[in-house]
UniProtKB/Swiss-Prot annotation:
The name this protein goes by in its record: Decapping nuclease RAI1
Entry EC number(s): 3.6.1.-
Family: Belongs to the DXO/Dom3Z family.
Pfam families per UniProt: RAI1 (PF08652)
Necessary cofactors: a divalent metal cation
GO terms of molecular function: 5'-hydroxyl dinucleotide hydrolase activity; GDP binding; metal ion binding; mRNA 5'-diphosphatase activity; phosphodiesterase decapping endonuclease activity; RNA binding; RNA NAD+-cap (NAD+-forming) hydrolase activity
Keywords: Hydrolase, Metal-binding, mRNA processing, Nuclease, Nucleotide-binding, Nucleus, RNA-binding
Annotated positions binding substrate: 228, 245, 267, 291
Quaternary state and interactors: Interacts with exr-1/rat1; the interaction is direct, stabilizes exr-1 protein structure and stimulates its exoribonuclease activity. The interaction also stimulates rai1 pyrophosphohydrolase activity, probably by recruiting it to mRNA substrates.
Job of this protein: Decapping enzyme for NAD-capped RNAs: specifically hydrolyzes the nicotinamide adenine dinucleotide (NAD) cap from a subset of RNAs by removing the entire NAD moiety from the 5'-end of an NAD-capped RNA. The NAD-cap is present at the 5'-end of some RNAs and snoRNAs. In contrast to the canonical 5'-end N7 methylguanosine (m7G) cap, the NAD cap promotes mRNA decay. Also acts as a non-canonical decapping enzyme that removes the entire cap structure of m7G capped or incompletely capped RNAs.
Amino acid sequence: MITRQVLILGHWNSRFRAFIHIHSAGQPLFSTMTAAFPIQPVARFAGKSELVKRPKEFACFSYDADHKFLLGAQSLKWYYTPDLNVDLSKGFESFIKHDDSVDEHLDSLLTTIADYEQKTSKPIDAHIVTWRGMMTKIMAAPFDDDDGFEMNATLYRGCIFIEENHAYKQASRANERPWNGPIPQEVMQYWGYKFETLSTLPKPWGQTSRDFIESRPDHVVNNKEQYCSVVRTGIGKTILCIGGEVDAIWDDKPRTQGDPINWVELKTSAVIQNERQANNFERKLMKFWIQSFLLGVPKIIVGFRTQDGLLVETKEFRTMEIPLMVKKNGRPKWDGDTCVNFANGFLEWLRHTITDEGVWRIKRRPRSAEIEVFKVEEVGHGDIITDEFMNWRIKLELRQAQPPTEDNETEE
């Protein structure tokens, strides 16, 4: 009879553990190595912020009203002050909602990167490619332990590509406690999209009719349409390529690529009437700040609404001023420098942990004091990287390996 034992090879620095499963003959059946990055104590990440490279947009893409992918800025929106005293629930019954049960992986981001590389004839120099949402979870980890997360990662051509583990996301939704509030949760989620519709124009103000502007409260809300910015940024020694949705622009894009863009992030929150609500808003500000910080969005406009969804006030926040504003409150719920330093430490550690191909899992259990990383597939890249992107990279490498011809020299 074959028996199994588990030999624990040990813990060192509280950051790495390895499990090897063996049978009675002493031959390995399989091996799983789990590395763990400790979040606590958070105090070790305090102090002056690590150097951050200003996010610079180098490409963009859009989804149209049917959520069809488009290279370019077709779905860019312009900010224009919304009317107040508008019911944010209005039009919910006609809401055109994107089906996010479909796993879109990194497909759109990779297609956009490949298009950029075709124009420049060289690969981007990022150490990590991912969505803004994944980096937001990582940066918020020291102060947000209620919800866990899972991500899939793979190493390809020296770069780590990270996506959300869609199966975990769907399972977490299915296991959520039933909502017992007076207003359905779906309606409250709709309020944010309604506020975006009330606050944006599809063209600059000078090209938009007064009738269109004044009729915005009656417009059908469609969250399938999106503009996504792709930026190059960096935290410490780690260069990042991040893609993420941008709600609107304040004026217009600069002519020179890489120059700062006056983006606007739109958010909603309950009117603050007591200390508990003030504390909740301060916690919300952390996510607001991280999301805008990562893409270089300088301005956040919050629509404050009543408990039943009436928009009563808008307030503008400067992204770079939010951490200091929170710090001045005496007993801050979070610290921006700590978020940056934690992300720097984790990303450097991750780059030394994911060092070969296969599919890796990045996992943080709810209320856990560590982030685990372990391999779930020994070879390949799963569905994280598309065949089209890999074929393009092979083609690019072959092109770069070719010696210059006389024709090429003449063209130059």
